[in-house]
Regions:
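Ser/Thr-rich, Pro/Gly/Ala-heavy low-complexity intrinsically disordered linkers and tails
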Residues: 16-134
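Extracellular polysaccharide-degrading/modifying enzymes targeting complex plant/algal/animal polysaccharides
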Residues: 135-481, 486, 533-538, 542-545
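Right-handed parallel beta-helix
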Residues: 419-430, 463, 483-497, 506-521, ...
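Extracellular recognition modules
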Residues: 830-834
């Protein structure tokens, strides 16, 4: 179904020229020609051609740091154009090509197929990207023996990268690698090192061929399904290790599971300090967990594939099983893989794996009784799957992931960063993660957030260890030691770990206009918990002096992060995690449906008041929807530790649950939060929350400025020292005054990038009119968002209206208008988008009240 806000790709002007050739002309192009993009009924055409991914940067040069790109998306940072010279973040090239290709955006939505589009191969014409040094083409149907022209493309991205290495030492213009549509299946990451950098202030682009969708796919396709028993199907899968993730018809399937009550621990696993590299201290933990034999069957094969997950108020942990035994008291004993089973019992503050309480056990074949679940028998190499309603296993696209990471950008010294790369219009899909390995054991445990315990350190807290006992997880895209790396207009989906991670010493880089969805952990992770100090040289420090660096000047703008922290065991991962960061700019993003909080900003609690590595961050004009779907004790925006110069302004929050299962807050300034300005928040939250904003005098919070909060409830604690905090203005029915409604309209993904938002997630009328508001009679201008098509009409009219005539109870604006007059008659109205044929496309959930 075609979205009402995203057209078919309007191919930008293409010109024939000799591909893979060197250009004698370098520098900035002169503006180029960007296609306006024709839009069908209900479609969207803005700026340059708004391709499937909605990219439209078609203008000329934009100076570094510019917040607009001429003719394009207007994304913060002046994101790279398609042609000409794009020397660094903030500098737009000037060629005319403006179709991103590849980002499925709203047309396809979260259920879009994984496969790429376009024929690839030898058809097509070469792309006129403006002045450049060279252009190469890659297609899944090409050959690495080819010269890399449009008629004879390479087959692999690594081949193109290696050829680029031979010509990029002293670049005279940008280099383009165009990826034709289709699946680029890999089993290990495509790596980029210093020798892969853009040089002489020029960039190297890896981007979609116009109108096509290249998919860097970390999975193998499973075929040959036959009926088994009880509605289950089976197929052969050549794999020797546990399968934790499976994707069927572009949707995640899950391992079989059952929630059971523990009978406590069994046995003891002792640890002696220094017995191995992971034994930082001595102690002991339970060696196994007991369950009733009526709850857990006798399991005789693939015992080491069993997993146990527990949930605390704000955390989840995973331990793995090595054996299943009968205990002396007549119970079933699941003996843990060690030493990770003991490590998982360490985290403090009630966040650890506990051998008592409620557990969810995964990977028992007998429990394969529900649609959308799978079981892999690695002993026989057989994959079993229970189809969802409507799935035909003879045609189903079943993807069994192999690769844990798809793109790995890294070097080992901050004197030799990877520089000046752009990845644009690409779909990154289908990764696995087999948990953290310590000796021969696996698991995933932490005290909080997108971190993982890596050693046994009993007797000390994470603060005592200066977080050296914590690490981050791998991601589908890993970036370290890099400068000016941009991800623009991509789709990142179906990850078994994190989405995009920029962990150590990444500077001047951008993540803009991406759709990030179905991620096991955080959609994006920036920084590292060990960056509380730089160069302090702890005994277990991950990053050596000269390698360690704060992530600085990272811009995250106009992204949709949807349905992340999806897997059990990953619940404490925020939609976006930022540890110690300097000048992080997080603006105009929409974070939707997260197990815990929308963004985790900061680290360190109150324990390191002299740390100066987290500062000058901005979190403005974002939208947070449907937070804390599993865990509690947080809010849409969560801050931790001091961060001088940080502003968190004009954010719109809709959907914080009540505290019946644990404490909940609209916003949460946790321990040590200080030197933060947090103004003009609009909080549409359940009246049963614990606090409107948890900024009370606890945990050494201080120097907070929180002004002009509007919320559906007023529940505030005692004010911390040196703080200025207004009492929230209460609007119980969430029908906001026009000024506050204006913040709602400005929040989230902007019009230039609206094509990344699936209509199935946010129908056009709710995109145009995102919140309820109240206006006095005679109001001539109520702000709205553009429907994206001037041929549409936008109406305020009474609910249920099917025939539209302007008058006292109905007002009209063009489909691309950004404001509309309120009806002159007092009453309650809805917003309708009507197509050029007069057909209403939908009635808004929000209302306008005219008084």
């Amino acid at each position: 179904m075609i979205s009402t806000r995203c057209p078919h790709v309007a191919m930008a002007t293409l010109m024939l020229f000799v591909g893979a050739c060197s250009s004698t002309t370098s520098g900035k192009g002169s503006g180029g020609t960007g296609s306006g993009g024709s839009a069908g009924a209900g479609g969207k055409a803005t700026g340059g051609a708004s391709g499937s991914g909605g990219l439209s940067n078609s203008g000329g040069q934009s100076s570094g740091g510019s917040t607009t790109s001429s003719g394009g998306a207007g994304a913060a940072g002046g994101v790279t154009g398609q042609g000409g010279q794009g020397a660094k973040a903030g500098q737009s090239g000037s060629g005319g090509l403006s179709a991103a290709g590849g980002t499925s955006g709203k047309d396809a939505g979260p259920s879009a197929g994984a496969g790429g589009s376009g024929a690839g191969g030898s058809s097509g014409v070469e792309v006129d990207g403006g002045p450049h040094q060279a252009a190469y083409y890659v297609s899944p149907t090409g050959s690495d023996d080819n010269p890399g022209t449009v008629s004879a493309p390479f087959q692999t991205i690594t081949k193109a990268r290696d050829v680029v290495r031979t010509i990029n030492s002293n670049m005279t213009g940008d280099i383009y690698v165009y990826l034709r549509g289709g699946d680029y299946r890999i089993t290990s990451p495509i790596t980029f090192a210093v020798q892969d950098s853009g040089t002489s202030n020029h960039r190297i682009y890896y981007q979609a061929y116009p109108g096509e969708t290249p998919v860097i796919n970390g999975a193998t396709k499973v075929t040959g399904w036959t009926a088994s028993t009880g509605g289950v199907y089976k197929a052969a899968l050549d794999r020797k290790t546990k399968l934790r993730n499976l994707y069927v018809n572009d949707a995640r399937a899950t391992m079989t599971s059952k929630v059971v009550s523990s009978k406590g621990g069994t046995g003891t696993y002792p640890v002696t300090s220094g017995q191995a590299a992971w034994a930082w201290a001595g102690g002991s933990g339970a060696d196994g967990v007991k369950y009733s034999t009526s709850d857990v069957p006798d399991i005789t094969s693939n015992k080491d594939d069993l997993e146990i997950v527990n949930q605390t108020t704000w955390n989840e942990n995973i331990v793995c099983v090595r054996d299943v035994v009968a205990t002396s008291d007549g119970n079933r004993g699941l003996m843990l893989q060690q030493p990770y089973g003991a490590i998982a019992q360490l985290p403090d503050s009630g966040a650890a794996f506990s051998v008592s309480g409620s557990h969810e056990i995964f990977n028992v074949f007998a429990w394969l009784t529900s649609p959308g679940h799978f079981y892999f028998d690695k002993t026989t190499g057989t994959l079993y799957y229970y189809p969802r309603t409507g799935e035909d296993m003879s045609t189903a696209d079943v993807e069994a992931p192999v690769a844990e990471t798809l793109i790995d950008i890294a070097v080992t010294s901050n004197t030799g960063r990877v520089k000046n790369l752009t990845f644009q219009g690409i779909t990154f899909a289908n990764t696995d993660y087999n948990l953290y390995k310590v000796d021969s054991s696996y698991g995933k445990s932490s005290v909080q957030g997108a971190t993982i315990y890596i050693a046994y350190g009993a007797g000390k807290s994470i603060h005592d260890w200066k977080y050296e006992i914590l690490d981050t997880l791998p991601a589908a895209i890993n970036v370290n030691s890099a400068d000016s790396i941009d991800f623009v207009g991509n789709v990142v989906k179906h990850s078994g770990n994190e989405g995009i991670s920029m962990i150590n010493d990444v500077i001047n880089s951008n993540i803009i206009g991406n759709f990030i969805t179905d991620i096991a952990g955080s959609g994006m992770t920036i920084g590292h918990p060990q960056h509380v100090y730089l160069g302090d040289g702890g005994a277990h420090e991950k990053f050596a002096k000269g390698v360690e660096g704060i992530c600085t000047k990272i811009t995250i703008n106009n992204n949709l992060v949807y349905n992340v922290a999806t897997l059990r065991g990953f619940g404490s991962h925020a939609g976006v995690t930022a540890f110690f960061t300097d000048t992080l700019t997080f603006t105009h993003n929409h974070v939707h449906t997260v197990a815990y909080n929308g963004i985790n900003l900061g680290w360190g609690w109150r324990n390191f008041p002299d740390s100066t590595t987290c500062k000058n961050n901005t979190c403005n004009n974002n939208r947070f929807t449907n937070m804390m779907t599993r865990l509690h004790d947080s809010g849409a925006v969560y801050t931790l530790g001091q961060m001088p110069g940080t502003v968190i302004n004009e954010n719109y929050v809709k959907g914080i649950p009540n505290n019946s299962s644990g404490p909940t807050y609209g916003l949460h300034n946790d321990e040590g939060s200080a030197y933060i300005t947090e103004n003009d928040s609009v909080l549409d939250i359940d009246k049963g929350v614990t606090y409107t904003i948890n900024c009370e005098d606890y945990g050494a919070k201080h120097d907070l400025t929180i002004l002009r909060t509007y919320a559906t409830v007023n529940k505030m604690g005692a004010k911390p020292p040196n703080s200025t905090i207004d009492t929230p203005m209460v609007v119980t029915d969430a029908v906001w005054p026009l000024a506050q409604y204006g913040f709602c309209v400005k929040s989230g993904v902007e019009d230039a990038w609206s094509s990344i938002v699936p209509s199935s997630l946010l129908p056009v009328q709710d995109y145009v009119f995102p919140a309820s508001c109240e206006a006095p009679t005679g109001t001539s201008s109520v702000p709205i968002r553009s429907s994206g098509n001037a041929a549409n009409a936008v109406w305020f009219a009474p609910t249920g209206t099917t025939s539209f005539v302007a008058g006292g109870t109905m007002t009209k604006a063009a489909g691309d208008a950004t404001s509309i007059a309120a009806p002159t008659t007092a009453g309650t109205y809805k917003l309708f988008v009507v197509d050029s044929q007069g057909k209403p496309l939908g009635e808004s959930a929000s209302l306008l009240r005219v008084k």
